Amino acid sequence: MAVLCGVCGIKEFKYKCPRCLVQTCSLECSKKHKTRDNCSGQTHDPKEYISSEALKQADDDKHERNAYVQRDYNYLTQLKRMVHVQKMDARMKNKRVLGPVGGHNSNFKKRRYDIDEDDRDSTECQRIIRRGVNCLMLPKGMQRSSQNRSKWDKTMDLFVWSVEWILCPMQEKGEKKELFKHVSHRIKETDFLVQGMGKNVFQKCCEFYRLAGTSSCIEGEDGSETKEERTQILQKSGLKFYTKTFPYNTTHIMDSKKLVELAIHEKCIGELLKNTTVIEFPTIFVAMTEADLPEGYEVLHQEPRPLEHTSTLNKFIDNAREEEDAEEDSQPTEEPVQKETQDASDSDSDSDDDYNPGLSMDFLTA
């Protein structure tokens, strides 16, 4: 049924007053309405009070829509959009004000995640060369990014790493044991890998692999080995250490199921990680045999590296290290080291570690 004009009541309505929603059929009826009802015809004032009776009367016949409610909803949506636009404009303006002017500015510290998603591939992430290691940086806020405390230690005058340990227990027939994951911090690049293993990880190794000559394996006794004793036990244990390998010089977010064995007795941590790729910080797999590794992982006995890119990348890394050393002499690019009460150069305990399994990267695809 056609709705008639609310003024003359003869013709079908064509217009609706923006303020009071009275329906009119012509300009003449619209003017009569404004004079009779003292209506300005302008959009409502959002601060104006609307009584509950008027709100109920604005319902349609089926009580499915309400003009006042719809009007307030549109107003709030528009207000939210306006605030969002102003916030983004202010953020972009701050970037232009704080950004370097006229080329490189050595005093300007570039933000870690100041890259718009529209300007790059969604699978591409920021890359930082740290001590010759290709570090893929995850978006800020992800758990693995928050756990990363790798930085230049000004007190010790060397680089310290965060390392994720994944212990693979010996698998027995009919029994499947869970992996043990732990993140250790402040591991010096000049140490051997086994020297960076703290008490918590060492005690778990004793439990998983029944290491001989340790008090942790004796029932009722807590581990009381010193750092030197733990290092000797691990070196004689026959444990194998692996790390993930990625496509050479990659910049795309991905996970890898391919591992390479590390020569822990020949090189220090800095030399082991050089010319490799890690996601935020290194992940080290520990197992007694290759068969104990998680299902789906493959060990490469020789890490594949394209020879045509080796010399170019090595030259690039050497230049990056020279620039990094020059910046460290003047103003370190890593976050400053906070003062600690304990000796940072010899920390046997894992009090500074995150006893947290960390972020699993299995959901990423190669």
Curated annotation (Swiss-Prot):
Residues with the Phosphoserine modification: S330
InterPro entries: BCD1, Znf_HIT
Zn finger (HIT-type) start-end: 5-39
GO molecular function list: snoRNA binding; zinc ion binding
Binding positions for Zn(2+) 1 per the UniProt entry: C5, C8, C25, C29
Location of the region described as Disordered in the Swiss-Prot/TrEMBL record: 318-366
One BP annotation, GO: sno(s)RNA metabolic process
UniProt KW keywords: Metal-binding, Nucleus, Phosphoprotein, Ribosome biogenesis, Zinc, Zinc-finger
Biased composition (Acidic residues): 321-332, 343-355
Record-linked Pfam families: zf-HIT
CDD domains reported in the protein's UniProt record: zf-HIT_BCD1
Cellular component GO terms held in the UniProt record: cytoplasm; nucleus; pre-snoRNP complex
PANTHER family: BOX C_D SNORNA PROTEIN 1 (PTHR13483:SF3), BOX C_D SNORNA PROTEIN 1-RELATED (PTHR13483)
Free-text function comment from the UniProt entry: Required for box C/D snoRNAs accumulation involved in snoRNA processing, snoRNA transport to the nucleolus and ribosome biogenesis.
Misc remark: Present with 2800 molecules/cell in log phase SD medium.
Record protein name field: Box C/D snoRNA protein 1
Origin species: Saccharomyces cerevisiae (strain ATCC 204508 / S288c) (Baker's yeast)
Name of the gene this protein is made from: BCD1
